[in-house]
Amino acid sequence: HYIFISSVQKYHFPPPTRVIVSDYNEGDSLRSLIRLLQEVEGTRVTLIGDVMLDRYHHGYSNNLNSTAPVPVLRVTNSEESPGAAAHIARGLFSMGLNVDFYSSVGDDDEGDLIIETLSSEGIQTDGIIRVEDRKTLTKIRFYGSRENLLDQSQVLLQADRGPLEDLDPRISEALTDSALGSLSSSQALVISDYDKGVISEQGSDMLISSAKKLGIPCIVDPKLTGLSRSSGADIVIFGIRGLELQKKRLMTDSLDEAASLLIETYSWGALLVLCLLYTSPSPRDHQP
C-alpha cells in the first residue's frame, strides 16, 4: 500500500487494521473526516445517489451454441443485491454509521427488493422515492468457465434493464432538498453519482457548498463523464482504471500528473484511488 502526494513523495506502510492520520493541514473538512474515521460508532452520514440492483448468475460453459459462436452457460447458482449508492449505504451502516439515505427506485419488484433488503438490515429507507411507472435499473451479469476451471470464472455477458427516459427533475430536486435538510445533523456528506438522474449539476453544487459552510467533509464517488458534479469535494474516489482512463484523456505522462491536474481543475481536496491518495502539496504526519 502506498500514499502518493502531488509533490511525488511516497510513503509505504503495511496493510493496517486501522490507519490514523493527523496534522493534515488540508482545512477543517479534511480534519473532520479524520475524526470521523477515528470515531465511527454512532456518527451520522448523509448519503445521496443513484441505486441499482446487481444480479449475478454463475455457472460453467463447456460448449458453444449450435447456431451461433456463443457459449452456453449452465447456471449453477444466482444471487442479487442492492448496488451503487445502496451498496455504499450498506457498507457505511456495517461500519456503525447512521445513514440518512436519499435515492429513487422504480415501482417494480426490483425496487421492492432493494428497499426490503436495506430495511431488513436496519437501514432507513424513508428517503427513497418510488417513481410510478418506472423501472429500476438492474445490471445482470453472467459468469462462467469450463467445468474443470471453476476458479477461473469470467464475465460472459452483461445485460442492463432499466428506464429509457430521464428521471423527472422534480424527483432529483426533492431528493436534494431532503439531503440538504439532513446536513445540519450529519458529520459527513457522501454523493454516489452514476449519472442516472438523482445527482444534477445544480443539486451537487448546492450539496457540496452547504457541506463546506457547515464544515463537514464531502466525499464523492463520481461518474467519470460528469466530474463537474464533484467540483469542490474534499475527497473524490476513483478505481485505478478510472484514473488510467483520465490519464489517456488528459494526455499526461503519468498517473501522478493526471491526478494533480484533476485536483487542480476541479478544486478537490484529495483524490483517493484504491490504495493511492493524491492531495495538494502540504506537510503531513502518517501514523500506521
Where is each model-derived feature located?
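Phosphate/diphosphate-binding loops
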Residues: 266
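Conserved N-terminal subdomain of the carbohydrate kinase-like
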Residues: 13-16, 20-24, 45, 53-190
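Low-complexity, intrinsically disordered or signal/transmembrane-proximal segments
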Residues: 1-2, 9-12, 286-287
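Residue-level marker for buried hydrophobic side chains located in beta-strands
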Residues: 45-47, 218, 236, 272-273
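Short coil-to-helix leader/linker segments, especially the first N-terminal amphipathic alpha-helix
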Residues: 11-39, 209-211
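Conserved beta-alpha-beta core of the PfkB/ribokinase-like small-molecule kinase fold
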Residues: 61-72, 142-162, 167-257, 277
